[in-house]
Amino acid sequence: MSAEVSHATAYADVADALADYFDGLYFSDTARLRRIFHPQAIYACATEGKLLHLTMQEYFPIVDKRPSPASRAEPRADRIVSIEFAGPVTAFVRLHCAIGPKLFTDLLTLIHVEGRWQIISKVFHFDLKSS
């Protein structure tokens, strides 16, 4: 197998894995999110001027409690901007999505462990939609 074919396959595999991420957020479905997030992943943001740093054990209950964008019939704004590889088992993804009034830019680092791509870190910024 050539490196070009391998890279194309890895790109497609990461993009496919992100379907669980996008669907998990849109439907507030932590079962889907647990498939894409490594159990030891971190979640971080400083958009509001201070560090927000959560473990998955802290993050998933927040998702479970919030009304899903799907339940409010919000239009989906999921878009992969880029996927880059640092090596065969490490990928960096920049993507956009929206939940409620927030437009997110997510920077995800994924690792390929246990036979699948998993998010090991999510660092993000958000802007509020214009009224």
Segments the model singles out, each with a brief description of its role:
Residues S6, D13, I42-L103:
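Surface-exposed, charged secondary-structure patches
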Residues F37, C97, V123-F124:
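Short beta-strand segments enriched in hydrophobic/aromatic residues
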Residues D16, Y26-F27, A31-R32, I42, ...:
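Short linear sequence elements within intrinsically disordered, low-complexity coil regions
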